[in-house]
Design a protein with these regions (language model features):
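Nucleic-acid endonuclease domains
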Residues: 1-31, 36, 44-190
Length: 190
């Protein structure tokens, strides 16, 4: 997970818990949901553009199986999605600082180097653009898959330890129907 996502998850969970109660969310398999009140929620951060400035509207959600299990238990799964414009580490200074902070090269990085795969661009900062809070039922997800605003993602991709990743789903945040949106705020969110 990138630092932006980690930071927003931690801050949001603390704020939600202190203002409206709730706890850390449950785990289903390897997937831990970030927050639980009446329903199960996950907090996401979504970069609105890639390192080349190309717009990105598809936000990666969770493990498909974990979402299904949460829906079976709670009936609704919610997502708190922060969209942001990233600052990319073009100079490599952020990566260098982070590598020094880690102290040693991770196994994932060693494997990447063996494959001669390029190191991905790091995000060194961001500006929050919007907050979108959505809730989805099983029926909403099925409808979204039929209509194309929810899709499968990451078949064949790998985790940091080299193991295969579980299938996730993505959502086109600009196509989510109004009946699934609880809050939509921006661009002057903060």
């Amino acid at each position: 997970m990138e630092w932006i996502g980690w930071f927003l998850e931690e801050e949001s969970r603390m704020l939600l818990s202190s203002k409206i109660g709730g706890t850390k969310g449950p785990s289903f398999g390897n997937t831990a949901f970030d927050y639980k009140n009446k329903y199960v929620w996950d907090i996401k951060s979504h970069s609105v553009e890639d390192k080349n400035g190309v717009s990105k509207t598809e936000c990666i959600l969770n493990d498909e199986e974990a979402i299904d299990r949460a829906l079976n238990e709670y009936g609704v799964v919610g997502f708190v999605i922060y969209t942001y414009k990233p600052d990319y580490d073009i100079s490599g200074d952020f990566k260098k600082w982070h590598d020094e902070l880690k102290g040693e090269i991770s196994e994932y990085e060693k494997e990447r180097m063996k494959r001669n795969a390029p190191s991905r661009s790091r995000k060194s900062g961001c500006v929050i653009k919007s907050l979108i809070i959505i809730k989805l039922t099983k029926e909403d997800i099925e409808k979204g898959q039929r209509e194309g605003w929810i899709k499968d993602f990451q078949k064949g991709m790998r985790n940091a330890d080299g193991s295969p990743r579980r299938n996730k789903i993505t959502i086109k945040i600009d196509k989510v129907p109004a009946n699934c949106i609880i809050v939509k705020s921006g661009p002057n969110l903060f």
